[in-house]
Amino acid sequence: MKLFIQTLGCAMNERDSAHMIAELRDKKHYTLTNDIKQADLILINTCSVREKPEKKLFSEIGAFAKEKKAGAKIGVCGCTASHLGEEIIKKAPSVDFVLGARNVSKITQVLERPKAVEVDIDYDDSTYVFASSQGMGIKAHLNISIGCDKKCSYCIVPFTRGKEISVPKDLLISEAKKCVASGAKELLLLGQNVNNYGVRFSHSHPKTNFTQLLRALSEIDGLYRIRFTSPHPLHMDDEFLEEFASNPVIAKGIHIPLQSGSSQILKMMRRGYDKQWYLNRIAKLKSLVPNVGIGTDIIVGFPTESEQDFEDTMEVLSLVEFDTLYSFVYSPRPHTSAFEYDKSMLVSPEVAKERLARLQNLHKEILSKKAQLEIGRIHNVLIENHYNGEGQCWSEGRSSSNKLIKILDKKCEIGSIVKVEITHNEGGGLMGRFINELSLSEALASKEYFQNPIYIQEGALC
């Protein structure tokens, strides 16, 4: 039997899809297909963080229903499934079952139940996260927690994924070792609020925090890098920052969601910090790791956002000079406190879109400047892809600080670690020259993120 799966949204959804694929392969003997007309089972793993993907869902269901072969089943999974539940089947009778984000481990059970709806956000089966860690190549994903307790005023995730529960450390270490034994060089730790790890465990467990987990995982033989997403700024204490800086296995690229640079808007968002607190944490981080790569999320057009509020956000963008930016216009979501705001508090779509364009244009200018400053710098690159044919030869991978670097005229083995000098950039993309290949021990000892010239201005963020 054949499975077609469409995954929308975040890395957590990608991981959930990988789990369902493995469950269906191992227990029901399904194989993947990219041709929907051949599929016996069609899964749509959905996202509900913004309204647009939810609206698009029903048109996609209709299209799939027309294309599918007779007898093929359609299942809707993920956060939109948690949010809308039975409403999905009422609006789209061609859907055979609905499976919430917290319930993906039940995928093989619901197949035989007509019009099954499983959307229990309190369901606790944290062991499911291990079902498909192996065989993922040089980069493996590992869920260390599920759910979120934060209740930010704009975010529907606590409603769709439930309360926060951490996976016991010994289980994580055991699974991480299996990933490395299967060829993984890099682990991506996943959690809705990943650095709040340890707040609540699925069963009795000694007290452990995120920093202690990172330290334990980094001791696994053969592991080159650990990345994680997404942390919350509030849990970036000094113990964590010092471990992040000093531990060579922890990649020196980090995503730190800002959401807004306005202290007033941050208060309305229930983020728990203000503009200056955020900047102080960034200043501390950059003092420890000068060339750290920092990504962020920003929402523009949040209710009551004034021009000055927006300018505060632009100022933070200019000061921090984020390496990656995920930016969106505010999308009101049911089951959030911001959804109840009076319509008079909303920013007009025209103003919000104009602000988003200004924000993104400023970020493009920042990236262009930073790309020029990279020329001549040395990075250790974990090779993720290569190509040799039709008169072209190149390899591609990421540095510790998460910079995507293309190496021209050299085919490097996927999974190898190579030293690269940045020679130029094309359209903001970094191009480099192969210097030499490194052993794992050589790469961990070189600390390329300290060897490069520092381009931040001391005290600029204080």
UniProtKB/Swiss-Prot annotation:
InterPro entries: Elp3/MiaA/NifB-like_rSAM (IPR006638), Methylthiotransferase (IPR005839), Methylthiotransferase_CS (IPR020612), Methylthiotransferase_N (IPR013848), Methylthiotransferase_N_sf (IPR038135), MiaB_methiolase (IPR006463), rSAM (IPR007197), rSAM_horseshoe (IPR023404). Residues 134-370 form the Radical SAM core domain. The keyword Metal-binding applies. GO terms for cellular component: cytosol. Its main location: cytoplasm. Residues 372-436 form the TRAM domain. It is found in: Cytoplasm. Binds 2 [4Fe-4S] clusters. One cluster is coordinated with 3 cysteines and an exchangeable S-adenosyl-L-methionine. Catalyzes the methylthiolation of N6-(dimethylallyl)adenosine (i(6)A), leading to the formation of 2-methylthio-N6-(dimethylallyl)adenosine (ms(2)i(6)A) at position 37 in tRNAs that read codons beginning with uridine. Monomer. Belongs to the methylthiotransferase family. MiaB subfamily. This is tRNA-2-methylthio-N(6)-dimethylallyladenosine synthase. It comes from Helicobacter hepaticus (strain ATCC 51449 / 3B1).
